[in-house]
């Protein structure tokens, strides 16, 4: 660090009661001897020696925490990083506020019924509204005001560590400020007047996309392929126009033409719906009744449109998608490389361009605080150094240093925080040692699996007796209550043996923790107050949670060789798919807000036009756009393409204008033809890529030669240490190489 930072660090160290600067500094080649130990990365970056700072930066880089490059090169780097970590520690608040913003869309009173409060509260059945409560105008303003204040803090907090110049260079920050201003104005207008239109529901979703990095990357990627998508859409439109004209001319004087293809516009609409196969074969039944060979026209149309053109569109779009997505990954990798280069420069104080053995060993020693590296001797550290020194000249260059960090991220887990019980002597007694060893053993796992199997049998029997209204049901409910205590004991033993930090690091344990406490508290209240709490006295909801607990049996599949790859691939794919599913959710939110503002309130009991629609005939009245929850469910039905033309044609009749078709057609083009097809293609390629990685691991295990290790390491050299990143980099290896070469 530069000398300009010394007074600042000394002042803050005195305030926090830290050791003097003499204990913080490390002499060259000392490898951390005599320096103060920091368990937190923020303290290490602000007050640590150069090895401690470098180790904290390496850990940040491998965790995917992106620090602006200008902040890395700032002379007041230590102070900036202390503010940066304060901002990161408040991430739970920023995330909770984003959730609150989206939740507000579901709890807001629909704009179309604000003039008459009775419509929303006392006549829910008349308008087929949902069961969620609505905020009053005052409650909405208070809620929006609180979320706005937190949003302002979230947006402007980066000023503390970036500074005004760096902050204002970011296009994302500028856009956030503009949207924040528009949102504040919208709230003010809403406070003093009742307008039928608001921008706030849309801006909330945009903030969600811009704040979550994965969603932002997906949105930028999709924006980059708009040009390609419009080109293939133009080709599809030409095909549809020509096929519709051919159908209109061919069936002009037939019953098909007189009933279904009565005009070119109607023919175009029907052929578009047939392109989605939603009205097949209803649309050409009349033509099929006269000469059967007329069916050839529609068969050829479906084959060309659905099985050729649609797949061609998917292939072109997915190829462009991979190129755009590779560009985003290159940017993420660039941030990681910049952080690692900063760590390299901190150690290479003499600007030699390489690190020697002593420096690498000192860094590995400091990394023990963040990664569960082997607690071994200096000789073992030298073996790690020798493995990474590919040139054999006892010098590690910046490129080899990146391989070092990548290997650490892949091979070693995060070091969990020590248990709070470590300070008590009894925790280190022989009896506690045997108990902890038993909890960590496979025998303990087998016992829990056996209890789960008993639980499954008990749930099945209790459910069967409930259906038969048998009095023996109460006995099995008591059995389930007893099993609940066993799960609580299991959770307590694991936390005691591992420590809560190590216990919470595993996703399976998080699932068990939440589920166990929810079921246990619910069962306890049900047995303690069977009549005072009507909601809890109904055991149905607890039974569903008990069935959820049986999902832990999927752990057994991981022990079977033939199933392990498939189960592991499933969980990896679920993690990698979350950003894309999040984008689909955001699109649904946008279209739901639009649907509420243009279709809200037109579906109600007693509407004479409604009774003439297929919406009424099919008993789809609950699937409407009268409030946000109902609109989201309706859009989900449209997303799965289940009779989606029913809503399109019904709202065409209800509004009396064909302009309403734009809403449904655009939703199909964006959500289904683009997003869902991309997700399907992504899942297919990701599955094959993950299977290749699994086979590669098996080969390396069976043939642990240096060549096999080198091949495996080179396959993951770009990754950030997580399975999702490894998978993405393997999938897009060709595109990434092309982006870097260009």
UniProtKB/Swiss-Prot annotation:
GO terms for cellular component: monoatomic ion channel complex; plant-type vacuole; vacuolar membrane. The chain crosses the membrane at residues 83-103, 141-161, 177-197, 205-226, 227-247, 297-317, 447-467, 481-501, 511-531, 541-558, 583-603, 664-684. Residues 1-37 are annotated as: Disordered. It is found in: Membrane. SMART domains: EFh. One of its GO terms (molecular function) is calcium ion binding. Its main location: membrane. CDD domains: EFh. Residues 259-273, 628-642 dip into the membrane without crossing it. It is a multi-pass membrane protein. Induction: By high salinity, PEG, cold shock, and abscisic acid (ABA). Inhibited by Al(3+). The keyword Membrane applies. GO terms for biological process: calcium ion transport; defense response. Residues 1-82, 162-176, 318-446, 502-510, 559-582, 685-742 are cytoplasmic. Keywords: Calcium, Calcium channel, Calcium transport, Glycoprotein, Ion channel, Ion transport, Membrane, Plant defense, Repeat, Transmembrane, Transmembrane helix, Transport, Voltage-gated channel. Pfam families: EF-hand_7, Ion_trans. Residues 335-370, 376-411 form the EF-hand domain. Belongs to the calcium channel alpha-1 subunit (TC 1.A.1.11) family. Two pore calcium channel subfamily. Functions as a voltage-gated inward-rectifying Ca(2+) channel (VDCC) across the plasma membrane that mediates sucrose-induced Ca(2+) influx in autotrophically grown leaf cells. Acts as the major ROS-responsive Ca(2+) channel and is the possible target of Al-dependent inhibition. Plays a regulatory role in defense responses. Each of the two internal repeats contains five hydrophobic transmembrane segments (S1, S2, S3, S5, S6) and one positively charged transmembrane segment (S4). S4 segments probably represent the voltage-sensor and are characterized by a series of positively charged amino acids. PANTHER family: TWO PORE CALCIUM CHANNEL PROTEIN 1 (PTHR46988:SF2). Homodimer. This is Two pore calcium channel protein 1.
